[in-house]
Curated annotation (Swiss-Prot):
Family per record: Belongs to the scolopendra toxin 2 family.
Superkingdom, taxonomy of origin: Eukaryota
Name recorded for this polypeptide: Scolopendra 4722.07 Da toxin
Protein source organism: Scolopendra angulata (Barbados giant red centipede)
GO molecular function annotations of the record: toxin activity
Main location group: secreted
Localization, UniProt: Secreted
Keywords linked to the UniProt accession: Neurotoxin, Secreted, Toxin
This protein's record includes keyword Lipoprotein: no
Length: 15
């Protein structure tokens, strides 16, 4: 699972 969905601001904000 990609954490980008829950904390997109922390992981790049792309998702």
């Amino acid at each position: 699972a990609l954490p980008s969905f829950s904390r997109a601001d922390r992981y790049g904000x792309r998702q």
